[in-house]
Amino acid sequence: METFAEYILREEDFAKKIEIMFYLKKKTNIFFDNTVIFKALIVKLFIESMEIDIDENKVVTAMLLCGCKKINNAQDIEKIKSYAKEGADFLSKLGFSKEFCLICEQHNRYSNSFPRKKESDILELADQFGGMLLDRPERVAFPIEEALILLENRNLKNCNNYYLNEFKEFINIVKEIKVW
């Protein structure tokens, strides 16, 4: 019998993946909303536009799933630090490989697991940058320029993200053609 992991990874159509995620949310009550779709779209556009040599389908799927155990209460710091690990454990039960689960777990740096996967660096960029572009209960969305500066000089200060320079180039291209 096919696992959920095999099922969603076999599907390469983005819209159909979104539909699969919608039904997974209904069945398991995972975290899945428009912010997840927005960040996954950033991943997809980044990989395609910059011609990144990586398994796009796997990374987009990971972006859709990496926050599956996220909570809406951003005030609980312990939950913020543990949701990626809890999500990776949950994904393992759905049949995802150790590598895939590690990619999802490493999308934030709280797991402290090394070496980091390149795919995790892409998730980290889309998650943090995309999050800054969205309104939150505690703040309004940042303008693109400010979000990019904060990403580099605050969020990823003293962090080695393999794709940061390419991501900045991508955002500047997107900004010029006024996609956002």
Which residues make up each language-model segment?
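Alpha-helical segment that forms one wall of the substrate-binding/catalytic cleft
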Residues: 87
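A generic secondary-structure signal
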Residues: 45-49, 90, 154
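Histidine/acidic-rich helix-loop-helix segments that form or flank divalent-metal centers
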Residues: 59, 63, 91-125, 130, ...
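Acidic/His-rich, divalent-metal-binding segments that scaffold phosphate/diphosphate chemistry
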Residues: 1-84, 179
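Short small-residue beta-strand/loop micro-motif enriched in glycine and branched aliphatics
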Residues: 70-72, 131-134
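Amphipathic alpha-helix face/heptad-repeat signature
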Residues: 32-36, 90, 118
